[in-house]
Amino acid sequence: MVRRVFLLAATALLAACAQAPAAPEGTLSTKDLHWLNTVSFGADQASIARLKAVGRQRYLEEQLKQPVADPPELAGMIAALPIATQDGPTRFAALRAARQRVNALPDGDEKQQARESLNKDGREVVLDASRRHLLRALYSPSQLREQMTWFWLNHFNVYANKGQVRWMLPEYEERAIRPHVFGRFRDLVMATVTAPAMLDYLDNAQSAANRVNENYARELMELHTLGVSGGASGSRYTQQDVQELARVLTGVGLNLRGEPPKLNPQRAALYRADGLFEFNPARHDFGGKTLLGVRIPSGGAQAGFAEVEQAVAVLSRDPATARFISRKLAEYFVADSPPPALVDRMVATFTRTDGDIGAVLTTMFLAPEFDRVLASGSRKFKDPMVFVVSSMRLAYDGRQVTNLRPVVNWLNQLGEPLYGHVAPDGYPSSEGAWASSGQMVRRFEIARAIGSGPAGLFAGDDGKPTARRGFPVANSRMFYDTIERTLGPSTRAALAQAESQAEWNTVLLSSPEWMQR
């Protein structure tokens, strides 16, 4: 059967798609379906019904106004995760105590086992953070918020296996990213500047007036705000600007001690702390600085952490930042090479609204240039996250899985594990990064795993089923109302030859049309 399904899927993958037939009266148009697949991680019956009822503009407004809080059923699932029971300081207090116990043990097997147990606890924190992220991507009605959370996690990337980052991941996504995905870009940047995971990952926690570390300053300018100097965003900055920003950021670090530092009384009032984050004035360079031609005062009310806030405002309001962020959003949602006129519209909105992300998204999703892209049949190629989540949302629409470990493993196999990108640039979103023959073979295998049965998705930690499993049925009423007409003749012919539901599911989820939004 495996060989037969592979041949059917390969036939569809190698064939060119014919123009989709018109939508039957009363159903969602093909353009609207592709629009919805872009705004969400993948259409389901509920989102299709809502878009049909209210139209694009109202649907988008509702998505942008969805509360940050999860709906009750989803909130209950997330509350059951172990990471929900501890905040950062509590987790690190327990970690300090555990490390002290391990260090007190004599060298030998017991000490080694205790270390391995502690490492396992750290891996479980990462797994729980991944589960929480995937639960929301799969089941939250706030699909645009979840997509933007994924987008900004990539943009402000941290790597779980660097330093202490794994222990800080839960708060990074929950406090630094999710609350700000539709807000002012400046506030989002500021939240990441004070995020312990970011400060540990990019080494700013080690930076002090007498030993400045430029790593975070460089990435904050090049990857998070302005773009590469001299690049497409039009940014122009020098190594001197990087050094000045690094001086501004001295003292921005971590407090993993569990108690505040002892400070000179003259500087004590400048100390700030929030959870594991601290601004320690004893480590800050109070000399005058100039960033991108803007003078940053060295004394009075503007000294200390106020310098950091001013620097973030300077970076966030620079014209290069407006273009860099607008183009990156358009590259993720619209096309690898988005229409220049669309990017210009987004830049104008970003500038006019002082970086209002929600307003920029509204401009993008409702722009005539985007509508023309949809009408042309050109669609974004799915990265592994979108491929896996959209496949799950179709195959198990309305059914709650209890074990997300297989989904986590599928993303690992496809090369896009959550919190697993080593470099600070995050995962790419272009087709060229994800369309290799090896990637396609792995996608076929995962399509078969999703389409052939529950694949452990309804099992508990002991491997035993915890709920009525149900078989995935991708050819639902939603398929016939919306998806079928988007398929080319070769894919439809391959589906007609399928000899079982599992084979049919696998062919659909392996088809060239399904690889695009």
What are these regions (language model features)?
Residues 7, 18-21:
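Short, low-structural-confidence N-terminal segments
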Residues 45-155, 159-171, 176-178, 267:
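N-terminal accessory alpha/beta regions
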Residues 71, 141, 145, 159-163, ...:
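Amphipathic alpha-helical interaction segments
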Residues 20-28, 33-47, 79-82, 318, ...:
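Flexible, low-complexity segments enriched for small/polar residues
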Residues 1-7, 36:
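N-terminal export leaders
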Residues 14-16:
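C-terminal motif of bacterial Sec signal peptides marking the signal peptidase cleavage site
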